[in-house]
Amino acid sequence: VHARRMHGLMNGIGADVPAQHLRYKRMHAPFADAIEEIRSEVTEHKINLVICDSASMASGGLISDEVGVAGFFLAARSLDTTILSIAHVAKSNENRSMVKPIGSSYWFNQARACWEVTHDQDENEPRYVLAINHRKGNNQQRQRAMAFRVEFDGDHSIQYHVTNPAANPTLNRTLSLP
């Protein structure tokens, strides 16, 4: 899945996949338990961005368990590189300006910045619009929302086009700043 998606993205911009710059590691243990192995790869390959999908699995326990969440953040910070962790939010959240990851409040509180990704997609359509909303930033002002129209050409390519998030009625209701 990851390789196919990366090929689609690179085809969408007319470029080759930079294989020497991308690494994928399937994890079978909590992030904190595997930190020495992860650190070794980060150091050996000079990795400057680690993407953790998903944060709940990386914590190694219940998402409401503050010990597991704190362990994840301590391990992540020990790498001394940028970490992007992907977490889910509760679907029933009525207060759109206070959207936070489900589980322990530590997911939101310990993060340096939080961005929410929402999308509007019709069934069986090869395109959708996604909005990216800045919900939290330590030592920085909140940023305006961004939006992209994403278009799929079968398994061949994926293209992203900048668009106005306020122009989509569904996504307009999710915006952090107008």
List where the protein language model places each region.
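Conserved inter-motif catalytic segment of the P-loop NTP-binding fold
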Residues: V1-V67
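Phosphate-binding/switch region of NTP-binding enzymes
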Residues: L49, V67-S157
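Short, intrinsically disordered low-complexity segments
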Residues: L22-K25, A111, H134, N172-T174
